[in-house]
Amino acid sequence: MGWWSLGSSGSKADPEKSKANDSKSSNRRQQEEGEQSFIPPPLTSRTSSSSSSKSTTDWNSSLNAFDWSQFKQPRNLIPTALLTGGILFVVYVQRRYLRRFPEATDISSSYFRSRSLLGRVTSVGDGDNFRIFHTPGGRLVGWGWLPWMKVPTARKELKDKTVHIRLAGVDAPELAHFGRPAQPYAYEAHMWLTSYLMNRRVRAYVHRPDQYKRVIATVYVRRWLDFPPLRRRDVSYEMLRRGLATVYEAKSGVEFGGTENERKYREAEMLAKNRRQGLWKDFGKRGGVNFESPREYKTRMQSLDMSAESSSSSSSSSNTEKNPGLVGSLLRKVWPFGSKKDGT
């Protein structure tokens, strides 16, 4: 009857036919694998160049890519902000509080009537002016005790490095200079100011510059041998109280540093007058010498200088007329008619 019958389950299939189907499926799989492994050659040079440039661009873009999100993390953001803020704060403090001015002409205009200078007195030129070496920050930043922040003492080292200060509100007797004689009590005022300020640290509240490349300032000093110790003293007030200076009087350019200082200075001058201290010793006495203030002394010296200049110019012109010189003598020989003074 054969191996296949109607009652048997399955499909009617021939063994040879199934083998053929298996061979076809294997051939199909091999063909698909061959297509996948096959890489077609480049079509043109243009296509290859475009693909290479594209790959180069992708490589550069991947190298230049930067991830900014890492800076937004607190572990990176907080130290960066603190470091930047610290640098800006140090620069601000240095420019505003630790900037050193070599001379009075270098002082910034923002300092006048609002800021002060801390420095050490290096020389006293007269009874009302002296020079300081500006030391911004003082001992707190190392001036005087750090090796590289010493105040110079030699005259050559101090050249063009000191601020010339004129005391505000006072006028001291003039020392002898420019051929002029010294005024009474000029030496005493100069010696007192030298002993009071020399080599000491002072604080000068600057008001404005003057025509002599100085800066007018109200100056304060602290001394250990004071009562109470280290009490802040106004140098101008102390000079007026001791009768070593007068209140500055002029038609213009008077600087007191405020109305309160002017009132205080005039009261100190009046007190010295009443006590007849210093240069007020013979003031108002009958038969005593006539009192001459520093302002009156300067005015008298200026008038004497002007009269001396006028007399010297007139004498030089008369000498020129009497002695005409080589050119004049030659002209007289050429022109024999003389002059009007000869009566012709």
UniProtKB/Swiss-Prot annotation:
A GO CC annotation given for this chain: membrane
Annotated region described as Disordered, given as residue ranges: 1-55, 291-327
EC category name: hydrolase
Residues annotated as domain TNase-like: 115-282
Cell compartments where the protein resides: Mitochondrion; Membrane
Basic and acidic residues bias locations: 13-22
Biased composition (Polar residues): 1-11, 300-309
Biased composition (Low complexity): 44-55
Spans traversing the lipid bilayer: 77-93
List of residues binding Ca(2+): 171
Main location group: mitochondrion
Record keywords: Calcium, Endonuclease, Hydrolase, Membrane, Metal-binding, Mitochondrion, Nuclease, Transmembrane, Transmembrane helix
Membrane topology: Single-pass membrane protein
Signal peptide: none
InterPro entries: SNase_OB-fold_sf, Staphylococal_nuclease_OB-fold
EC numbers, comma separated: 3.1.-.-
Entry similarity comment: Belongs to the LCL3 family.
Name of this chain's protein: Probable endonuclease lcl3
